[in-house]
Amino acid sequence: LISFARSLVKTDGVSYDAVMSMAINLDNQFNLPADYGSLDSRWNRNQVGPFIKLLKKFVKDSRFDAFYHSNENLYQEAVSRFMPIYKSIDTQWYNDFYGQKSNDRFHIILSMSNGPGNYGPSVTDKENVHNVFSVMGAWVTDSVGMVVYPPELILPILIHEFNHSFINFDPEMFRTSGEQIYAAVGEQMARQAYGQWSIV
């Protein structure tokens, strides 16, 4: 799986938010829905099946389920520390600000394995509900190494990540200008996890 995933980075640019796109589309058995049109376009459709097969094998071989459950106290502590921020988020603001009446469902994923990476993917489910996500990394810790979520740092990032679901669009209409701009600033943007023109 690891070698295959690395090859997808090199051949198709499957990295950053493309990985999160796969994660939110998978069900609890690591299956994709029959129609996975919301999967990031960097996922080559010919590679999705082999990736899922290898992922399931990895989950089984690594005894991931046992690992996950052995760390439940850690996850619960992270959730407890995040709750003040969770309680301060006003999801109605997005509808008011963007002028949309919608049945969006908001989800926060605390991903302590992401380090400082944060993402804002979305998926529309079979009931036509738009599920918007803020996948929050963990990079600030206390004196014993436990994650902390300083509101003044984390809340603006959380809001930013949810915004992606309301403003992302098909970038192809801006390909020419996007490629020109990225040629000039690509090196600096890549250091900020924007590895190609279409995600800037």
For each feature predicted by the language model, list its residue ranges.
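Auxiliary, metal-adjacent structural segments of Zn-dependent hydrolase domains
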Residues: 71-132
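Second-shell loop/turn segments in exported
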Residues: 76-84, 143-148, 193-197
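Beta-strand/loop-rich accessory regions of lumenal/periplasmic or secreted enzymes
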Residues: 112-115, 147, 163
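Post-HExxH zinc-binding segment in Zn-dependent metallohydrolases
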Residues: 1-21, 27, 169-200
